Amino acid sequence: MKEGKALELFNLSTFVFTIINLLVLYYILKRLLFKPVTKFLEDRENKIKSALEDADKQREEAYSLKAQYEEKLQNAENEGRAIIEKAQKEAEERASEIIKSANKEAESIIEKAKEEAVLEKIKAMHELRAEMSHLIIEAASKVLEKKLPVEDEDLIKEVIEEAGSWNK
C-alpha cells in the first residue's frame, strides 16, 4: 500500500499537466514579461551608452574650446605685448629725434652766438681803430698845434691798421 500511495502521489497525468502548465506559463511570461523587461533593459543600456558617448563628445568639445580660448588668449597677450613694445620703441625713437633736434638747435644757437661774437669783436676793433686814429690825430695836432691835412689822416689810419694786423 505504501507503494500505491506513492504512485497516487505521483500521477502521470498530473505530472504531464503540470509540465504543460509550466511550459504555457513560461511562454506567457516570456511573451508578456521577459521580452518587455529585456527590451526595457536593452533600451536603458542603449540610452546610458548614448548618454556616455554624448558626455565624452561634450567633454572633448569642451577641451577643444578650452584649448582654442587659451590659444586666443595667448595670441591676444602676444599682440598686446607687441603693441606695447612697438609703442615703447616709437616713443624712444621720438624722444631720440626730439633730443637730436634740440641738440642741433642748441648747436645752431651756439654757432650763431659765436658768429655774432666774432662780428661784434670785428665791429669793436673797427670802432676802436677809428677812435684811436681820431685820438692820435687830435693828439698829434695838439702837439703840432695845427690840424693835419686829410692825406695825413689816411696815412695814420694805414699805420694803425698795419699795427692792428700785427696783433691778430
From Swiss-Prot:
It is a single-pass membrane protein. The chain crosses the membrane at residues 9-29. InterPro entries: ATP_synth_B-like_membr_sf, ATP_synth_b/b'su_bac/chlpt, ATP_synth_F0_bsu_bac, ATP_synthase_B_chain. Keywords: ATP synthesis, Cell membrane, CF(0), Hydrogen ion transport, Ion transport, Membrane, Transmembrane, Transmembrane helix, Transport. GO terms for cellular component: plasma membrane; proton-transporting ATP synthase complex. GO terms for molecular function: proton-transporting ATP synthase activity, rotational mechanism; proton-transporting ATPase activity, rotational mechanism. Its main location: membrane. Pfam families: ATP-synt_B. F-type ATPases have 2 components, F(1) - the catalytic core - and F(0) - the membrane proton channel. F(1) has five subunits: alpha(3), beta(3), gamma(1), delta(1), epsilon(1). F(0) has three main subunits: a(1), b(2) and c(10-14). The alpha and beta chains form an alternating ring which encloses part of the gamma chain. F(1) is attached to F(0) by a central stalk formed by the gamma and epsilon chains, while a peripheral stalk is formed by the delta and b chains. F(1)F(0) ATP synthase produces ATP from ADP in the presence of a proton or sodium gradient. F-type ATPases consist of two structural domains, F(1) containing the extramembraneous catalytic core and F(0) containing the membrane proton channel, linked together by a central stalk and a peripheral stalk. During catalysis, ATP synthesis in the catalytic domain of F(1) is coupled via a rotary mechanism of the central stalk subunits to proton translocation. Belongs to the ATPase B chain family. This is ATP synthase subunit b. It comes from Caldanaerobacter subterraneus subsp. tengcongensis (strain DSM 15242 / JCM 11007 / NBRC 100824 / MB4).
